Each structure stands twice: as structure tokens, then as C-alpha cells.
From Swiss-Prot:
NCBIfam families, A to Z: ahcY, PRK05476.2-3
EC number: 3.13.2.1
Pathway connected to this protein: Amino-acid biosynthesis; L-homocysteine biosynthesis; L-homocysteine from S-adenosyl-L-homocysteine: step 1/1
Catalytic activity: S-adenosyl-L-homocysteine + H2O = L-homocysteine + adenosine
Protein name, as recorded: Adenosylhomocysteinase
Species per Swiss-Prot/TrEMBL record: Acinetobacter baylyi (strain ATCC 33305 / BD413 / ADP1)
Molecular-function GO terms, alphabetical: adenosylhomocysteinase activity
Cofactor entry: NAD(+)
Keywords: Cytoplasm, Hydrolase, NAD, One-carbon metabolism
Positions in coiled-coil regions: none
Binding positions for substrate per the UniProt entry: T68, D144, E169, K199, D203
């Protein structure tokens, strides 16, 4: 044999602090984790860089993020750097059961399986927080969407006395953090991982470019070429989604509220339209732009906002159209309204929603309006998630070393904030990713650096620079 055989997980029967769908999937998960590690040079580089220092020794992290193969690499990186973790998924459909099994088999407490009910999802969060009937002495939070952060603040506020900080992965969670900071309910500092360039451009844009069309094709087996799509929102997620559909040959239109994003869509060659006449969202069927919606084969929401695909739009949309969401929560599409109709499950996370007794009058709803690329497929590639998760690790180290919880009470208020990682750390993640692609960065000469007014080793752009 010319290669080293992968050592499979040996499940310790005495370890029971987990709940997954099928622990026997652990070996399968371990094989995929090894493949993912080869595609995640930034994370593996952090393991090597901090192997001796163990900067997270003493960290006890509550983690709530999609329990995927790529997340398994993140978890094991945190553990290798000294942390203890307890994990849940942030979405009822996004868990990859073999990934959860592999993590459980390695001795890490994890509570996640694909297809949880809302009640089971909440149960998992409670199991994560509580050990032997009382709250775990956690001192860090790693979140995606803000559910864990909200639960700790609202139900377990005494835990916050020991929490050094929160790192938040996604747009929706950052919005919630900013609201909490504004109204004074945020009690610890937080790092906005979402707006690191190596997260927002990789995950939000390039990741969605890869994974959206993959999810739709797996769910429907449809040829997308020549069909008409409406992308709601043209932020980074919307940009990647529009590219994803265009590269499949779809005719893509965009709807936007932000004139700058709308201008970008125009410059990128997309027609900017509105589902409502004159762009005024009244919620009334008589004000719907019928010419648009009756000629739309696919709607995808990308905004992180509320009811951007509302009941009036759903009732007037072309029969047989596909409706899906690649934002975080299921509130972008008014799925509660659709619950009043007859649902027929075609296969897991694919439903025909019949709007009348006419057998042809249905919509195809994917992932019940939740995150389609993880509900109907396997999400972003490992190489994309490498940047996001390297930022999470650096954010956890940054906040853990600040030791907010150890500050005198009189000094804490001034330290509560929501901020992005320093640009130098963002550039370090990017450099590791470039190296992973086999790229070679050119170094500035001292003369060039002086001319630009930047250090030779960076950071190379001001904080105001728009990538």
C-alpha cells in the first residue's frame, strides 16, 4: 500500500453527551473531513501556526452554526488550538448527518440532525447550554444568525458574566447584534465576521455563485437554461446568486431597494425591475406587476429581510414556478401564508404548494423557504468556507485574549461594541487562501510602499476601501 490509510473514528461507548441522527455514519464523515482539510489551507495553516501557543486554551465555546463537513474542520481547529466546544446547528435542515456523527465520535458534544422540528431545534440549543442540569461555564459564543446569542441574553443572562465575546457569521445575525447594541441590550463585545472581506466576498458572493444552481438542480432536476429568474436583492449574496443562474443560461432580472446596488445590477447587465407597479409595495394583488410575475419561472430571495416575497406575489406568480431562499431565515418568503394551501411533499425539502383545486396551479417551494443551498444541497465548497471559518478562529482568539469578562464592571460598558476584524488579519486569511491556490503574491519595494503610504507588509488599503 503506497499511502497512509485514514484512521477511522472509534466511537467511545461511554461518551453520550450528544444527539445525532446516526452515529454509525462517523467513518463516512471522517473521510469527507479529510478531503475538506485538503481544501482549507487557511484553517490548517492556523493549526500549524498556533500549534505550540494554544491561544484558545481555557476557552469554552458555545457554537451554533450549520453542522457541515466544513464546520467539522472549524470545530477541530478550535479544539486543536486548546478550546472546549459544545455545538448545535443554526438551521433545521442544514446539518450533514455524517459530519455531526464524526464530530460526536471524536468526543465533542454536538446536538444536530437534518430535518429537526422547531421544538427539536430549541431542545438542541438547551442541551448545548446545559450540562447535568445546569448551565455550562462557557466563556465564548460563536454564532450564525443570532439565535444562540438571543437565547443566552434572554434566558441565561447570568452566563454573560463569564462571556468574553461573540463572533457572528452572517448578515442576519449582525443585524440583530447591531439592534441589540443600539438599544443597549448587548452585554458583551462582538465581532462581525460577515463583513470581513474574506467572508463577504468568498462566502456571500463566490459561495452562492457555486451553490445556488447546484441546489435548484438537485431539488428539481430541471434544465434552467432559457428560463426566467427573479433575484430579490443585489448585495453580495444577490450578486453571487444572479451569476449562478446566469451561468446556467437563465434570463435573470433583479429587484432592489438600494439605488447603489440597483446601479451595480444595471452595470452588470441585469434588468432591474419591481414585482409591484411603480415599485410601491402595497401587498395588494391589484398592484402586482403581472407582466413580470406571470413570466417568471424562478424566484430566489437573498436579502435577510422580511416578506420580500409576499402573499400577493405568491398568489400571482406563474403556476409551476420555483420559489426558494438563500438568505438565513424563512421569513423572506411568506411561508406562513402558504401554510393555508395544500402541500404535497415530492421528496425531502421539495414541496408542491397547490393554490387551488386545479392540478396545474402549484408552486414548487424548496427547503420550506429556508436556506436552499444547505437544505437541498451541500452548501458552499470547502475552499470558500475556508476564509469564513479562518475569520471565526481569529475572531475567537482576538476576543478571548481581550478577556472582557475579567474587566472591572466600571470599564465594561466602554468595551461593548460590534466591529470587524482588523484589516491586517483579513489580509492574512486572504494570503493563506492565495497560497492554497498555488498563487504567488508580489511584494512591494520600500520605495513603492513609501509612495503609497502603506507598510511593506500591509495592510495595503484603508478601512474605507471598497473591494
Amino acid at each position: 500500500m503506497f499511502f497512509k490509510e485514514i484512521v477511522m473514528n472509534a466511537v467511545n461507548a461511554s461518551f453520550t453527551d450528544y444527539k445525532v441522527a446516526d452515529i454509525s455514519l462517523a467513518d463516512y464523515g471522517r473521510k469527507e473531513i479529510k478531503l475538506a482539510e485538503a481544501e482549507m489551507p487557511a484553517l490548517i495553516g492556523l493549526r500549524k501556526r498556533y500549534a505550540a501557543e494554544k491561544p484558545l486554551a481555557g476557552a469554552k465555546i458555545l457554537g451554533c452554526i450549520h453542522m457541515t463537513i466544513q464546520t467539522a474542520v472549524l470545530i477541530e481547529t478550535l479544539v486543536e488550538l486548546g478550546a472546549e466546544v459544545r455545538w448545535t446547528s443554526c438551521n433545521i435542515f442544514s446539518t450533514q448527518d455524517h459530519a455531526a456523527a464524526a464530530i460526536a465520535a471524536s468526543g465533542v458534544p454536538v446536538f444536530a440532525w437534518k430535518g429537526e422540528t422547531e421544538e427539536e431545534y430549541n431542545w438542541c440549543l438547551e442541551q448545548q447550554i446545559n450540562v447535568n442540569g445546569k448551565p455550562w461555564d462557557a466563556n465564548m459564543i460563536l454564532d450564525d444568525g443570532g439565535d444562540l446569542t438571543a437565547l443566552v441574553h434572554e434566558k441565561y443572562p447570568t452566563l454573560l458574566d463569564h462571556i468574553h465575546g461573540i463572533t457572528e457569521e452572517t448578515t442576519t445575525g449582525v443585524q440583530r447584534l447591531l439592534e441589540m447594541w443600539k438599544d443597549g441590550s448587548l452585554k458583551v463585545p462582538a465581532i462581525n465576521v460577515n463583513d470581513s472581506v474574506t467572508k463577504s466576498k468568498n462566502d456571500n458572493k463566490y459561495g452562492c455563485r457555486h451553490s445556488l444552481n447546484d441546489a435548484i438542480k438537485r431539488a428539481t432536476d430541471m434544465l434552467l437554461s432559457g428560463r426566467r429568474a427573479l433575484v430579490i436583492g443585489y448585495g453580495d449574496v444577490g450578486k453571487g446568486s444572479a451569476q449562478s443562474l446566469r451561468q446556467e443560461g437563465m434570463i435573470v432580472r433583479v429587484t432592489e431597494v438600494d439605488p447603489i446596488c440597483a446601479m451595480q445590477a444595471c452595470m452588470d447587465g441585469y434588468e432591474v425591475v419591481s414585482p409591484y407597479k411603480n415599485g410601491v409595495q402595497t401587498g395588494k394583488k391589484e398592484d402586482i406587476n403581472l407582466d413580470l410575475l406571470k413570466n417568471t419561472d424562478l424566484i430566489v430571495t437573498t436579502t435577510g429581510n422580511y416578506h420580500v416575497c409576499d402573499s400577493a406575489m405568491l398568489d400571482t406568480l406563474k403556476a409551476g414556478a420555483v420559489v426558494c431562499n438563500i438568505g438565513h431565515f424563512d421569513t423572506e418568503i411568506d411561508t406562513n401564508y402558504l401554510r393555508g394551501y395544500k402541500w404535497v411533499e415530492v421528496k425531502p425539502q421539495v414541496h408542491q404548494v397547490y393554490r387551488s383545486e386545479n392540478e396545474n396551479d402549484y408552486l414548487i417551494l424548496l427547503s420550506e423557504g429556508r436556506l436552499v443551498n444547505l437544505g437541498n444541497a451541500t452548501g458552499h465548497p470547502s475552499r470558500v468556507m475556508d476564509g469564513s471559518f479562518a475569520n471565526q478562529v481569529l475572531g475567537q482568539i482576538h476576543l478571548f485574549q481581550e478577556k472582557f469578562a475579567d474587566l472591572p464592571a466600571s470599564e465594561k460598558a466602554a468595551q461593548i461594541r460590534v466591529e470587524v476584524l482588523p484589516k491586517k488579519l483579513d489580509e492574512e486569511v486572504a494570503a493563506a487562501m492565495v497560497l492554497g491556490f498555488g498563487g504567488v503574491l508580489t511584494q512591494l519595494t520600500s520605495v513603492q510602499a513609501d509612495y503609497l503610504g502603506v507598510p511593506v507588509e500591509g495592510p495595503f488599503k484603508s478601512d474605507a476601501y471598497k473591494y
